[in-house]
Amino acid sequence: MRNKLSFDLQLSARKAAIAERIAAHKIARSKVSVFLMAMSAGVFMAIGFTFYLSVIADAPSSQALTHLVGGLCFTLGFILLAVCGTSLFTSSVMTVMAKSRGVIGWRTWLINALLVACGNLAGIACFSLLIWFSGLVMSENAMWGVAFLHCAEGKMHHTFTESVSLGIMCNLMVCLALWMSYCGRSLCDKIVAMILPITLFVASGFEHCIANLFVIPFAIAIRHFAPTSFWQLAHSSADNFPALTVSHFITANLLPVMLGNIIGGAVLVSICYRAIYLRQEP
């Protein structure tokens, strides 16, 4: 009887062809379908970050093991993305392969990317409301909410260059994880291939614009709308988190990180690998 367990992997050129076909297929979907799938992706990312934060909320931030375990927990969000076939902005930038092939123009690519980003934001907003009304912010004597605040505050003090660089490295890992998942022939293969790259980016503190769309606006909401009882339990005050404002988030984090994510995914993975494996020889 043939053993079904196998380490048989797709060849690199085969992976590139698969990635190109997936990119073209994503672009060809209806706008409603793209938006709904992007909403699901936003929810999954928020779920992954909620798992991550629930694990590290009461742990010392200096412990390497805490970062490792937190990173492993965060991979849940990406596993859900891979299994359910949704559209995340940072991985959808790989659809630039379809542009390189000449299937679409830049306008179509840009509209698709913006639609996915808006869908991700809508999904995150829906899940954030559930988290807010669930009372989790007050759990563990408000430690859960305080962890959100400290995590978000720490993301707001990078320089522009640092934020872009962290964004590049983050989406390099995310898109390589996705690329590696194309190697696998089974669900287990795909999941295992994704775990370490995602864990690395989380444990190393790289910046992901869609994850930040969940954690930082939610932390801003806590800072402005949390009841007095929250601050009493936390033995803190809103004044201890001055960087958590909408304008500062957009200029100091969201825009530079998004730029870095686009460079990391579209240029360093999609365009480079297409040039290596699918470029037509003269």
List PLM regions with ranges:
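Alpha-helical transmembrane segments and their helix-helix packing motifs
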Residues: 1-282
